[in-house]
Amino acid sequence: MGACFSSHTATAAADGGSGKRQQRKGDHKGKLPDGGGGEKEKEAARVEFGYERDFEGRYQVGRLLGHGQFGYTFAATDRASGDRVAVKRIDKAKMVRPVAVEDVKREVKILKELKGHENIVHFYNAFEDDSYVYIVMELCEGGELLDRILAKKNSRYSEKDAAVVVRQMLKVAAECHLHGLVHRDMKPENFLFKSTKEDSPLKATDFGLSDFIKPGKKFHDIVGSAYYVAPEVLKRRSGPESDVWSIGVITYILLCGRRPFWNKTEDGIFREVLRNKPDFRKKPWPGISSGAKDFVKKLLVKNPRARLTAAQALSHPWVREGGEASEIPVDISVLSNMRQFVKYSRFKQFALRALASTLKEEELADLKDQFDAIDVDKSGSISIEEMRHALAKDLPWRLKGPRVLEIIQAIDSNTDGLVDFEEFVAATLHIHQMAELDSERWGLRCQAAFSKFDLDGDGYITPDELRMVQHTGLKGSIEPLLEEADIDKDGRISLSEFRKLLRTASMSNLPSPRGPPNPQPL
């Protein structure tokens, strides 16, 4: 379903390596096949990970499940409990470069970070001996998502069934992003069903190309699988948004049985991804609901800043059908935007509040879900404790206690010690999505927000008008507040300058080239 390429050295998947899993029969009677090695084995013996070294005593090895570039994956049985597991064995002799060792360590760290999520393969433990590393995980026997797609009539899912599958993939992406991770290789081959039942949960199994996010950075390498790669990956400036693009490609395939971008060569596929739009005219698209088409289009927006986040996508009416608001995780971009809001000038904060007040309920569905996720006691407002709980998650930054209070105070425009929904919206708007997805509506919203300050309707905001807007509660000199937006330095703000000010408000959460983030005390 798609060639795998990478300029990033990595252990590949829970299948023992990158590429298609190969189903094999055979019992190895408790011993793993010898990979050979000679001098390489002696060299490998010097690589130490610090993992437990009693794998053979703990597990009875069974049939081979698959293999790849770096090793094999086997079924195994826990000798003490009788539980069946999957074991990924990675050959130390093939870790000839330090980066390969770091990749194994990172993959184990990632599996530990994501442990416990219902749609991510469960990690039990990591072991090693002189020759191999063993990663013990949940055994999934329902086959790949790819195989189920191919088994469907015309290789298509019904909309209802597709939404169930896509919802699970989005939950994985949202969980990764909340933990400061980007998956980087979302494709049907990397999702397994727990069992052969039709309603079996889907499990993400391959984190070999995954990497950590560091705020303010981007990935500059090209990794992933050709059919699912996002445009920004090919431009070597990618982040968590690339996972959402890949899920958009998978959704397109689930609904129509075809790839949205196809060519005979890898370079040709890349050209299609960069230049062309998916086709929604050929059958079966005319018979597919407008909601499904709207959903796919919003995931396949070429500009990553205008693309839905994974958590936003979970709030879309099509994929949410049958799902509950409580199932929607907190969006990393919402927390990042709140953190950024504190750094804005007072006038920019005022402008965002004015913009928020112009938006209609249907435009705010995803932010309402986010507000409800943080408002644990369902009081209709977010308290300091609820905000502290939301911001205490395992983020790519670390907030000290006083900073949480500072965020609350910046967002809380009426100074009642709580954050209501309108205040929350002002601090968490995805400005670039609004501006890019519907430029006409964006223009009308900016005009409406501008009019709240332009009291005499002459097309400019003056210091006197800003002073007269009572809800700002300003004292002292007003002129300094306008300086940031007053590009032509004429002492007043035009509509064009106002719109540019709003456009500078954007999410600052971007990923790093390599390695886990160093928490940044603020």
Curated annotation (Swiss-Prot):
Main location: membrane
Signal peptide: none
Name this protein carries in UniProt: Calcium-dependent protein kinase 4
Family annotation (PROSITE patterns): EF_HAND_1, EF_HAND_2, PROTEIN_KINASE_ATP, PROTEIN_KINASE_DOM, PROTEIN_KINASE_ST
Organism, as annotated: Oryza sativa subsp. japonica (Rice)
Catalytic activity as recorded in UniProt: L-seryl-[protein] + ATP = O-phospho-L-seryl-[protein] + ADP + H(+); L-threonyl-[protein] + ATP = O-phospho-L-threonyl-[protein] + ADP + H(+)
Top-rank taxon, per record: Eukaryota
Keyword flag Membrane: yes
